[in-house]
From Swiss-Prot:
Cofactor list: a divalent metal cation
Functional pathway: Carbohydrate degradation; L-fucose degradation; L-lactaldehyde and glycerone phosphate from L-fucose: step 2/3
Matching InterPro entries: ATPase_NBD (IPR043129), Carb_kinase_FGGY (IPR000577), Carb_kinase_FGGY_CS (IPR018483), FGGY_C (IPR018485), FGGY_Carb_Kinase (IPR050406), FGGY_N (IPR018484), Fuculokinase (IPR013450)
Gene behind this protein: fucK
Catalyzed reactions: L-fuculose + ATP = L-fuculose 1-phosphate + ADP + H(+)
Protein name per UniProt: L-fuculokinase
Family affiliation: Belongs to the FGGY kinase family.
PROSITE patterns, A to Z: FGGY_KINASES_1, FGGY_KINASES_2
SUPFAM superfamilies, per database record: Actin-like ATPase domain
Secretion signal, residue range per the UniProt entry: none
Lineage, uppermost ranks: Bacteria, Pseudomonadati, Pseudomonadota, Gammaproteobacteria, Enterobacterales
GO molecular function: ATP binding; L-fuculokinase activity
Amino acid sequence: MKQEVILVLDCGATNVRAIAVNRQGKIVARASTPNASDIAMENNTWHQWSLDAILQRFADCCRQINSELTECHIRGIAVTTFGVDGALVDKQGNLLYPIISWKCPRTAAVMDNIERLISAQRLQAISGVGAFSFNTLYKLVWLKENHPQLLERAHAWLFISSLINHRLTGEFTTDITMAGTSQMLDIQQRDFSPQILQATGIPRRLFPRLVEAGEQIGTLQNSAAAMLGLPVGIPVISAGHDTQFALFGAGAEQNEPVLSSGTWEILMVRSAQVDTSLLSQYAGSTCELDSQAGLYNPGMQWLASGVLEWVRKLFWTAETPWQMLIEEARLIAPGADGVKMQCDLLSCQNAGWQGVTLNTTRGHFYRAALEGLTAQLQRNLQMLEKIGHFKASELLLVGGGSRNTLWNQIKANMLDIPLKVLDDAETTVAGAALFGWYGVGEFNSPEEARAQIHYQFRYFYPQTEPEFIEEV
C-alpha cells in the first residue's frame, strides 16, 4: 500500500523546495533549488520576482523526487511563501506588472510619505503591521501613483502564494495569512480595512475571497500537473505565509512565545488578545494574523547574531569556530566583571561597551555581547507580554542561534524561565503539512494533526551554578 503524504511547495527568498510529509510529520522526500530575484528592466537598483521562474523551480524540485513521489499517494498540496509580495493580474491570471520584491527600494519613499494619506500610528493600530518599506500597501500605492491605468485594468491583486495557487488550480483566492502581512487588514475584524483602503485609494474589489489555512482552494489542473509531473486532481489546500506555519509547526501553544534566533532575532507569540494601539510605541514591532482564526501573532525583531558576527570579526576572524569564542566567554563570571554592551549597532549612538579595564579580555567583550543581547530580549519579551496580554512561563527557541549553549543558558538565567530548544529546522514545512492533513479531512483539527508528532526538545533551566546543560 502506498504511503500517504502531503506535498509542501515552499517558496523561500533563497531556496524553492518541494517536500513530502507523512501523517506523523516525517519527511519522506525533499528537493531544493536556489531562488533569486531579478533586476528590473526599468532601474538596475530595483528587484522583482519571475513567477514563471519560481514555477519552473518547483517543477525541477518535483522531478528530482519523482521516483519517491510515484511510491506515494499525494493526498494534498500546500503552498508556503514569504509574505507581502504579489502582483496585479487580469481575468486570466496573467501578470499586468512584475512581482515587486520585498528587497526592492522603490517603495521606501512611499512609506516615508504615507502620513499624507493616513497616519503611520493609525495604520499600525488598525492593521497591526509595523512600518516596513516592503509592506504590500506601499507597493499598491506605488503602482497607483506610477501606473494608475494598471489598477483600473486589474481583475485582482494576488499575493505570491495565491499566484502559485492560481497556476495550480485556476482559482482566484487570498490566503488570510498573507493578507495579514499586507498592512491593509483590520486585524481585529480579520478582513480588509475600509478605512485604510479608502484613505489610500485602493479598491476592495481587487482582493478575491479570503481563505483560511486548511481550506481547500481547488484541485490540481491539467497544465500544472503536467508541469510538475504529478497526477491531475490533487486537492490544493490553503497555507500561505511561512512565519505562521513555522510557529504552529514548532509546536507553539497559545501564549507560549517563540524566539527564532539568527542574524536577526524574531520574537512572536500566538495570543488571543492584542493591544495594537501599543505597537507603534515600539520600534520593530508588528502583529500578523495567526494561522488559526481568533489568534494573533504580535512580535518584534532586532539584530542579534549579526552583532556577534561583528564581534567575532573584530577580535578573532570571520572564520574562527564559534566554540572558541564560547569557551573563552564561559570562563568569565556572569556580569562579565562589569563590562556591559549596548547592542543596538544599527540605530543607537551609545552602542558599544562600558566598564572596560586593563584586565578586560576579548572573552569579556563577547560575554558582554551575549548578556547585552539577552537584556534586549528580556525587555522585548516584557513589551510583548504587555501587547499580547499574556505571561510567559517558558520560551521556545528555534534557529541557528539556538546552537549556542552558553547563550541559551544566559537567556534562561536572565529571563528566569525554562528555555525549550527545538533542533528541527523544518518547522514551516511541518506546520503547512499539518494544515494540509486537516484540510483533506484526515484530522478534525490542525491540533489533532499536530498531536501525531513526537517533538524532541532540549531544556535549559534557570540556575546560579556554573553553566551546565541538561539535555532531555
